[in-house]
């Protein structure tokens, strides 16, 4: 199974790096495509794309990850869509977005880039999982990543287009 990992906090987020390593250790083929900037609050937007402003990306390295990683100059939903279209290899079976630095509950999900990436996946029949954290002293990335990996089995058995939001 191929997993696309993205987020809205940007490619350099330590939580994203930890999640990528743990999902890969769980047996998934992992590709990371995340914004090159903090894209918090972008929802499911695609950003501005035109002939004058094409989509740029660069290859990155994530310590301890065998899979590829890319920083894309666009919001998380664009990371999902370009991955679905084959820009970074085979289409993913699941999109995992996060872990976000802060909750995504209630009305805030409408504006969340983390949730927006997972919702963009379901538009193409791909399962999605948005992951967010609330406690920041310290950030408990390891725990959030363990819960994420635990949810992947049931999620992969769920119908296509299933999206979960873990907080």
Give residue spans per PLM region.
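Proline-centered loop/turn at the N-terminus of a beta-strand
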Residues: 2, 29, 125-127, 162
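Glycine/threonine-rich flexible loop motifs
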Residues: 103-112
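Glycine-rich phosphate/pyrophosphate-binding loops
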Residues: 122-144
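A cross-family phosphate/adenosyl-ligand binding-site feature
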Residues: 3-6, 13-86, 90-91
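Electrostatically charged, flexible surface regions
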Residues: 143-167
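Alpha-helix C-terminal capping segments
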Residues: 83-89, 116-127
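Short, Asp-centered acidic motifs that coordinate Mg2+ and/or phosphate
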Residues: 94
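Short beta-strand segments
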Residues: 6, 33-35, 97-100, 131-132, ...
């Amino acid at each position: 199974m191929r997993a696309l990992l993205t987020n809205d906090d940007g490619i350099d987020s330590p939580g994203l790096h930890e999640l990528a390593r743990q999902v890969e250790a769980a047996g998934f083929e992992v590709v990371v495509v995340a914004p090159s900037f903090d894209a918090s609050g972008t929802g499911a937007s695609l950003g501005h794309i035109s002939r004058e402003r094409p989509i740029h990306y660069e290859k990155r390295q994530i310590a301890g990850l065998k899979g590829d990683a890319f920083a894309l100059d666009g919001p998380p939903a664009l990371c999902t869509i370009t991955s679905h279209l084959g820009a970074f290899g085979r289409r993913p079976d699941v999109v995992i977005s996060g872990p976000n630095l802060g909750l995504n509950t209630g009305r805030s999900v409408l504006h969340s880039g983390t949730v927006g990436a997972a919702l963009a996946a379901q538009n193409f029949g791909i399962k999605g999982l948005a992951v967010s954290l609330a406690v920041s002293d310290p950030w408990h990335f390891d725990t959030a990543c363990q819960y994420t990996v635990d949810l992947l089995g049931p999620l992969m058995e769920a119908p296509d287009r299933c999206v979960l939001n873990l907080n």
